Design a protein with these regions (language model features):
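Glycine-rich hexapeptide-repeat left-handed beta-helix
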Residues: 1-17, 51, 57-59, 65-68, ...
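N-terminal segments that cap or nucleate solenoid repeat domains
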Residues: 2-42
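Short proline/glycine- and basic residue-enriched helix-capping loop/turn segments at helix->loop/beta transitions
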Residues: 85
Length: 174
């Protein structure tokens, strides 16, 4: 069973709010001020640490194996829109990601970064603090730089398919 835990911070009890149909892998960790929308999934060894600030996950998102989402006390939060795919071993620290975006395996997003709707961050990319990635842009490298623009229909379709696949994978565990 996944570790889902409330915490006490600043005199408040903060309990994860998780939609009833969310898949949580047995060793996923969800702590503190975390909200996860319907149809989403949090996979093996993923950690969502809402202990120091808020993490909001939209609908039909997938947080894949080994990813870590954490924030900065009194400074940065995390918001993922709907149909966001977070690849294996991604680190998101205080960054926001809009609907239909894809964060490739092993990428890192630092505080204050923003990934626009339908954007793609390539595997292994390092998105530096405060970087603003526009809608449907593809970025990659260390540090991440703009590569090209993608068609909105392409990125939306890619992430709908990934979300559908991860919903299917989650159904195998019920």
């Amino acid at each position: 069973m996944a570790l889902v835990r409330s915490i006490q911070r600043d005199g408040l009890t903060l309990t994860p709010q998780i939609a009833s149909d969310v898949f949580l892998a047995e060793n996923a960790t969800v702590v503190g001020e975390v909200s996860i929308g319907e149809g989403s999934s949090v996979w093996f060894n993923a950690v969502l640490r809402g202990d120091v600030n808020t993490i909001t996950i939209g609908k039909h998102c997938n947080i894949q194996d080994g990813s870590v989402l954490h924030t900065l006390y009194q400074k940065s939060t995390i918001t993922l829109g709907d149909y966001v795919s977070v690849g294996h071993n991604v680190t998101i620290h205080g960054a926001d990601v809009d609907d239909y975006a894809l964060i490739g395996m092993g990428a890192t997003l630092l505080d204050g970064a923003h990934v626009g709707k339908g954007a793609i961050v390539a595997a292994g990319a390092l998105v530096l603090k405060g970087t603003q990635i526009g809608d449907c842009e593809i970025w990659g490298g260390v540090p991440a730089k703009f590569i090209k623009r993608a068609e909105p229909e392409q990125t939306a379709e890619i992430n709908r398919k990934i979300a559908h696949n991860y919903a299917m994978y989650a159904s195998w565990y019920n």
